[in-house]
Amino acid sequence: MKKNIALLLGLVLGLSFVSCSSDEDDDENVNGKGKYLAEMTVTRYDWKDGKRSDEGKLYQIYKYNEKDQLISQESPYFGYRQTPIYNDNGDCTEQKFYNYKTDEYLGYNKRELNLADSVFIIYSYNWKNELVSTTKYEYTYGYKLIRETEIIDSIGKDHGKIWTYSYSENTQTIELTNLKDGSLIEKQVNELDSYGNATKATINVFYDFALSPITHEYTFKYNYDSQGRILRKTHSTVSQGYTEYTYNNDGTIKKEHYAEALNTDYKEIYDLEYTYKYKKK
């Protein structure tokens, strides 16, 4: 879900402004010259017995300032909210997390960026200011991710996982290994189109049981429009589910339709609908 949200936010923040009439200038639901995205709201509508609920549940709310910086992310459905903190250069250096209902402080992330070494590190702390985990991202000088290391500090420095990324002309390969012994946990091969989008992902998961190792293979497929926007994601051959995406005329995401199945009996179906509010600068 994180990747989907990052993709959708990128679509929202990358919009080009369109000209509007004077009446539209005062309409907070219409984008236009001299305006900025102030808020994006995501509402969930569940399906049951072939019918969609008329009553939606507030899923997530994103709020932005005039600099296009995220200033608040509220997640009522998941029960938390976060507040980013920026330095004078406009870089997010910290994120604080709170319980959505009680406003109880949950902890924070501290973020460090080293451009010279192409390294980005996130330190995660709990409400007692104890270090829980450290995640280090390493990039090439062309800003391609090549390695991600997660250390579970609350357990021990040798506990965690490593993701290693490698690239060819039309593929991306991701290998997930155990930090402690280097054993292979998962291998994913993404087939890429001319935009660099994954059109097919094949994932092999390795289970190292005492008597005999077992490997399971999962395949996901992705379809895009002529602008490189995702239209449909077909979930693994095991679940046989899918996600479909529709867009507004200005390119912003309008709706996600999600259906997860076991064989052909769909167990979970819902829509995520996106609405936007704009303000004058």
Question: Where does each model-flagged region fall?
Answer:
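Sec-dependent N-terminal signal peptides
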Residues: 6-11
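C-terminal motif of bacterial Sec signal peptides marking the signal peptidase cleavage site
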Residues: 16-19
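Positively charged n-region of N-terminal signal peptides that target proteins for export
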Residues: 1-4
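Buried hydrophobic residues that stabilize the cores of well-folded domains
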Residues: 23-281
